[in-house]
């Protein structure tokens, strides 16, 4: 794999020689994020042709929708995707070697009077992606967008009455799962602003939208009903039980034929503890089959390795400043996938490791990979992450890992890491490039 210590003639370097950029903003976005993206593709075993294709798509179809390049003194749209408002995040399914990235589409009218709450940019972005990838279907995209994001009238009402006081205004984002030369597209919806406009809770908006959908697509009804019953029991007993109430925070779905698409409901869990995670995993004891129990054993193993601090936590109301070193811990989260013709929702739990030491997290993951036969990942993961930030004191960093997700299906663990993706590789590439994350930067290594 090509690393920052030995750049050679890697895909990123060659494309950087070829590409022209229509603006300095896009040029900065490319050189800030593509080194890590290219290394991740290489590390995950994508062939050279697929690496060029995915990086080319990223440059042509994604970077134009990332907005102004963030600096400490520049006004910009803040995205809920990351704690400092960056609109892009790389993630890696370490056990399946699948690269993924998520972004909140932003354009020139985002945050202006023409689109105060960034409702419109995603429409243009998703249409462009649909032109280059076969199989994208927008039926459920359109349905959930109508149900969970502001319409023109609601946006005008919120704006004219100044009803939105919060920093966090994200309504939707897209994700691409890169599978060989192709990609699968997903959409995520955050109905917080819709909640302000309608007076309905975010939780009710999400569950009501899925209920309506399940009346048309009854093959997801059994799993949805099990999830509804579990959440109802948890929330009914929240005041007397050690576990707190569960609240839906966001929803996602695959942008494919609705007969094959999955719906995922994400629940915010404010109590971080192993017992709560076990409850989320088993749906309060309803899932007790052999595969679930095997997954539970691995979940407990990860909990022991990662050493996530326990506590009852609130999600922060605002963002961290760009470059600010976190001194916080986030609450937990789980999502439940509703598969067609499957009576049980499938859980995926999230270890909230943001703010913890990245070197220690990398070491813990390496042990897990070694124990379960993921030898290449055990050998390469920490090296890849260090080489993505070669000018930083890796032992001191505590913001590279945001979450670690875990699920278990077909007798196999699925573990993904969600990573800080900004000022990667040999940044700054140019003398005039801004540096925001400098708290743990060492003397710059020689590039000779």
From Swiss-Prot:
UniProt-recorded Gene Ontology molecular function terms: tryptophan dimethylallyltransferase activity
Q: Which EC class does it fall in?
A: transferase
One Gene Ontology biological process: ergot alkaloid biosynthetic process
Catalysed transformations (reactions): L-tryptophan + dimethylallyl diphosphate = 4-(3-methylbut-2-enyl)-L-tryptophan + diphosphate
- Applications: D-lysergic acid amides have been used as medicinal agents for a long time. The pharmacological effects of the various ergot alkaloids and their derivatives are due to the structural similarity of the tetracyclic ring system to neurotransmitters such as noradrenaline, dopamine or serotonin. In addition to migraine or blood pressure regulation, there is a wide spectrum of potential new applications of this interesting group of compounds.
Arranged from A to Z, the UniProt key words for this protein are:
Alkaloid metabolism, Transferase
Which of this chain's residues are annotated to bind L-tryptophan?
Answer: 80-81, 89, 190, 249
Query: Could you tell me which Pfam families the record lists for this protein?
Result: Trp_DMAT (PF11991)
Q: Which residues bind substrate?
A: 100, 186, 188, 262, 264, 266, 348, 350, 414, 418
The record, for InterPro entries, names:
Aro_prenylTrfase, Aro_prenylTrfase_DMATS, DMATS-type_fun, Trp_dimethylallylTrfase
Q: What is its EC number?
A: 2.5.1.34
Pathway annotation from the record: Alkaloid biosynthesis; ergot alkaloid biosynthesis
- Coiled-coil intervals, chain numbering: none
Q: Which family does it belong to?
A: Belongs to the tryptophan dimethylallyltransferase family.
The entry's function note states: Tryptophan dimethylallyltransferase; part of the gene cluster that mediates the biosynthesis of fungal ergot alkaloid. DmaW catalyzes the first step of ergot alkaloid biosynthesis by condensing dimethylallyl diphosphate (DMAP) and tryptophan to form 4-dimethylallyl-L-tryptophan. The second step is catalyzed by the methyltransferase easF that methylates 4-dimethylallyl-L-tryptophan in the presence of S-adenosyl-L-methionine, resulting in the formation of 4-dimethylallyl-L-abrine.
Q: How does it assemble?
A: Homodimer.
State the protein's name: Tryptophan dimethylallyltransferase 1
């Amino acid at each position: 794999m090509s690393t920052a210590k030995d750049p050679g003639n890697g895909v990123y370097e060659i494309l950087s020689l070829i590409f022209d950029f229509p603006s300095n903003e896009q040029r900065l976005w490319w050189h800030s994020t593509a080194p890590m993206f290219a290394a991740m593709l290489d590390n995950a075993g994508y062939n050279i042709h697929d690496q060029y294709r995915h990086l080319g798509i990223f440059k042509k179809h994604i970077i134009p929708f990332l907005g102004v390049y963030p600096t400490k003194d520049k006004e910009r749209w803040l995205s809920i995707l990351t704690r400092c408002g960056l609109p892009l995040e790389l993630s890696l399914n370490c056990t399946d070697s699948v690269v993924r990235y998520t972004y909140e589409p932003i354009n020139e009218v985002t945050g202006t009077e023409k689109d105060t709450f960034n409702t419109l940019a995603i429409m243009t972005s998703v249409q462009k992606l649909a032109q280059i990838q076969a199989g994208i279907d927008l039926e459920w995209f359109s349905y959930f967008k109508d149900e969970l994001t502001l319409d023109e009238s609601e946006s005008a009402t919120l704006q004219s009455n100044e009803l939105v006081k919060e920093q966090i205004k994200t309504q939707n984002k897209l994700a691409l799962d890169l599978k060989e030369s192709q990609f699968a597209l997903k959409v995520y919806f955050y109905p917080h602003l819709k909640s302000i406009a309608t007076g309905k809770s975010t939780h009710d908006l999400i569950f009501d939208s899925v209920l309506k959908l399940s009346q048309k697509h009854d093959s997801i009804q059994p799993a949805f009903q099990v999830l509804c019953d579990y959440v109802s029991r948890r929330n009914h007993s929240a005041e007397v039980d050690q576990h707190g109430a569960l609240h839906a925070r966001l929803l996602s779905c695959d942008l494919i034929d609705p007969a094959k698409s999955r719906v995922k409901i994400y629940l915010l869990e404010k109590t971080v503890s192993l017992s709560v995670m076990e409850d989320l995993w088993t749906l309060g004891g309803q899932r007790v089959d052999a595969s679930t129990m095997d997954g539970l054993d691995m979940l407990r193993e990860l909990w022991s390795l990662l050493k996530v601090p326990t506590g009852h936590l609130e999600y922060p109301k605002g963002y961290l400043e760009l470059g600010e070193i976190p001194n916080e811990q986030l609450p937990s989260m789980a999502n439940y996938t509703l598969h067609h013709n499957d009576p049980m929702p499938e859980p995926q739990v999230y270890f909230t490791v943001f703010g913890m030491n990245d070197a220690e997290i990398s070491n813990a993951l390496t042990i897990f990979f070694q124990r379960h036969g993921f030898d290449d990942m055990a050998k390469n993961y920490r090296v890849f992450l260090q080489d993505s930030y070669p000018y930083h004191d890796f032992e001191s960093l505590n913001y590279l890992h945001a979450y670690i997700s875990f699920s278990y299906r077909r007798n196999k663990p699925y573990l993904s890491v969600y990573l800080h993706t900004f000022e990667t590789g040999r940044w700054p590439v140019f003398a005039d490039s801004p540096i925001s994350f400098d708290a743990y930067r060492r003397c710059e290594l020689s590039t000779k």
